[in-house]
A protein has these predicted regions:
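Short beta-strand->loop
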Residues: 97-108, 255-271, 280-283
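A ligand-binding cleft/hinge motif common to bilobed small-molecule-binding domains
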Residues: 86-89, 237-258
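Gram-negative bacterial Sec-dependent N-terminal signal peptides
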Residues: 5-26
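Periplasmic-binding protein-like
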Residues: 204-213, 219, 257-278
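Mature extracytoplasmic/periplasmic domains
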Residues: 275, 280-341
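Conserved C-terminal helix/tail region of periplasmic/extracytoplasmic solute-binding proteins
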Residues: 228, 336-367
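Extracytoplasmic ligand-binding site segments that recognize negatively charged/polar headgroups
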Residues: 81, 87, 91-217, 222-231
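Early extracytoplasmic/lumenal segment of secretory-pathway proteins
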Residues: 28-90
Length: 367
């Protein structure tokens, strides 16, 4: 499974002499750490061909994993892609360097509507550029869910995944939840009728209650396996990221396997998140990192990425190059009414983060 493999676009095998040459020319290498299944790999080849810079590309599937590397320092990466809430905390911890705008001629392509929203995590957008944004919501195998719950199954509502009566029935065809407490807790709070950005003990207890009530019916907590599981018909519901579920829809259609996947941002409200590209403070090659960011901000390159991964991007100039399947899909580029229903959240402070981690461990173990 490509999600599980450690993906590298370039394997450097060289003699000691060549290795010495390479160490003298480190500016000619850039190391990027991005989410899995999150770019058109042809862009990686194109970058190497256009710039002559060797690109080493590794992947992860959890913000917590990335944050551990960022806060420890010495990751060896030149470009990383944290989600906004995590980025904010990492900027405050001194993990990133300010971008040199003089090296980012394509910055003008960026979309002011999105930059206004990302500024709450990165004031003035001085440390990062938006790569992709999306929502967290409900992916369903429409045929199986209808079979189990009937034609009026609440596939657009949090009731589908948080009402124990529904979940007990759905457990017969398989349900996956994201292994991402900062995504799942706001959804549980929304279902409980509370502010999704609350982080106090009372709110966490309410979220825990919602999750524990359906815990017996959750087959797995994982942040990437649900794509193939949905596409193959192995599960019938996933609470996950918009573009990942739409990728599952696309894979099922390509396989022509009779599986029909649909994505919905919950009508009660959905989390809107932003994945930002940033340069670590100790990046070995900040020069090459800027070259990579500028390449990504090219309108056609950014469009190619979105057309491949089914996520909206923060690049206004890319819109004319987006395929209709992407720009015309309100699950990817929401209409005004849906946008109004989307909420953003702030980072968890250290004490609350520890409470969250403890609670999440408890929920996952079901004890």
């Amino acid at each position: 499974d490509q999600r599980e493999t450690f993906m590298k676009t370039h394997l450097l095998t060289m003699t000691a002499g060549a290795a010495l040459m390479a160490s003298l020319a480190t500016a000619e290498e850039v190391r990027v750490y991005n989410w899995s299944d999150y770019i058109d790999e042809e862009l990686l080849t194109k970058f190497e061909e256009e710039t002559g810079i060797d690109l080493i590309y590794d992947v992860f599937d959890s913000n917590e994993l990335l944050e551990t590397k960022m806060l420890a320092g010495g990751s060896g990466y030149d470009v990383v892609v944290p989600t906004g809430t995590f980025l904010q905390r990492q900027i405050q911890a001194g993990a990133f360097q300010k971008l040199d705008m003089s090296k980012l001629s394509n910055k003008d392509n960026m979309w002011d509507v999105i930059e206004k929203r990302t500024a709450q995590y990165d004031p003035g957008n001085e440390y990062s550029i938006n790569y992709m944004w999306g929502t967290t919501g409900i992916g369903v195998n429409t045929g199986k869910v209808t079979e189990v719950l009937g034609a009026d199954a609440p596939i657009t509502s949090l009731d589908l995944v948080f009402n124990p009566e529904n979940m007990e029935k759905l457990s017969s065809c398989g349900v996956h939840f994201l292994d991402a407490p900062t995504e799942m807790i706001p959804a549980a709070l929304t279902y409980a009728g509370l502010d999704p950005d609350r982080k106090d003990d009372e709110a966490l207890a309410a979220a825990e209650e919602v999750l524990m009530a359906v815990r017996p019916y959750i087959q797995k907590f994982h942040s990437s396996e649900y794509i193939n599981a949905l596409a193959n018909g192995d599960i019938c519901v996933a609470f996950g990221w918009s573009g990942d579920i739409l990728q599952a829809r696309d894979r099922a259609a390509e396989a022509d396997n009779g599986v029909e996947v649909a994505y919905n941002a919950p009508v009660e409200g959905a989390l809107m998140w932003f994945d930002q590209m940033a340069i670590p403070v100790d990046a070995p090659n900040p020069e090459a990192a800027h070259t990579f960011l500028n390449f990504i901000m090219d309108a056609q390159n950014m469009a190619a990425a979105s057309n491949y991964v089914y996520y909206a991007n923060g690049n206004a100039a890319s819109k004319e190059f987006l395929v209709e399947d992407v720009i015309g899909d309100t699950a990817i580029y929401p209409d005004e009414a849906t946008l109004d229903k989307l909420y953003t959240v702030t980072p968890f402070p250290p004490r609350e983060q520890r409470s969250l981690t403890r609670m999440w461990t408890k929920v996952k173990s079901g004890t």
